[in-house]
Amino acid sequence: MDVLYFAWVRERIGVAKEQVSTDACTVADLVKELSAREERYQVAFQDMAVVKVAIDQVLVSLDTPLGSAKEVAFFPPMTGG
């Protein structure tokens, strides 16, 4: 699946997009798996209360199953006006 990172999440991880093969069942499992890779992922995901997640462009929670997701995106909350 494609994993996308936006704004300061991208800056901390150092890439905007990567292809990831995973056995993770949920978003939380994917975060744990990525965080185990390198410290830069740990830094980006250290406070998941301030990171939003979307699967195939639909906002989801950490306990959401990945299922057959083609894309998972991580980004900070945004405001508009």
For each feature predicted by the language model, list its residue ranges.
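Ubiquitin-like/PB1-type beta-grasp interaction modules and other compact soluble beta-rich domains
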Residues: M1-G80
